[in-house]
């Protein structure tokens, strides 16, 4: 579960390295976000020559979480880090590559491109 003030790693090649959650979207008084949900983040560290700059406010989708996710067959999948991919204001993926493992639960109509950008799907 990701809440406000949580630091997250960026798992794509957009240029950001570390981001901080400033708002959990999709609810008026929602406190936590899980895998697959969209949050508002601010960039804390970024690569030197990239489109993403420090202190830039963007949207992001959570792709990995330490708390994990429970599947319908009863298995629980947890990760070692909290990771996101950065989105623009129209909620489209900025990057051209995604690093690390992606869950197949993230495949939906809106983010079908996400599965093709990653090389490892569980």
Swiss-Prot record:
CDD domains: Ribosomal_uL14. Keywords: Ribonucleoprotein, Ribosomal protein, RNA-binding, rRNA-binding. GO terms for molecular function: large ribosomal subunit rRNA binding; structural constituent of ribosome. It holds the Pfam family Ribosomal_L14. GO terms for cellular component: cytosolic large ribosomal subunit. The keyword RNA-binding applies. The keyword Ribosomal protein applies. GO terms for biological process: translation. Part of the 50S ribosomal subunit. Forms a cluster with proteins L3 and L19. In the 70S ribosome, L14 and L19 interact and together make contacts with the 16S rRNA in bridges B5 and B8. Belongs to the universal ribosomal protein uL14 family. PANTHER family: 50S/60S RIBOSOMAL PROTEIN L14/L23 (PTHR11761), LARGE RIBOSOMAL SUBUNIT PROTEIN UL14M (PTHR11761:SF3). Binds to 23S rRNA. Forms part of two intersubunit bridges in the 70S ribosome. This is Large ribosomal subunit protein uL14. It comes from Carsonella ruddii (strain PV).
């Amino acid at each position: 579960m990701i809440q406000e003030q949580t630091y997250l790693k960026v798992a794509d090649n957009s240029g950001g390295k570390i981001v901080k959650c400033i708002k959990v979207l999709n609810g008026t008084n929602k406190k936590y976000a899980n895998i697959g949900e969209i949050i508002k983040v601010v960039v804390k560290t970024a690569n030197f020559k990239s489109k993403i700059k420090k202190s830039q406010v963007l949207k992001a989708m959570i792709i990995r979480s330490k708390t994990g996710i429970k599947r319908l067959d009863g298995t629980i999948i947890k990760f070692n880090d909290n990771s996101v991919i950065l989105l623009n204001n129209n909620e489209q993926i900025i990057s051209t590559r995604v690093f690390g493992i992606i869950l197949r639960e993230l495949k939906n109509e809106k983010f079908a491109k996400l599965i093709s950008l990653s090389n490892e799907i569980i």
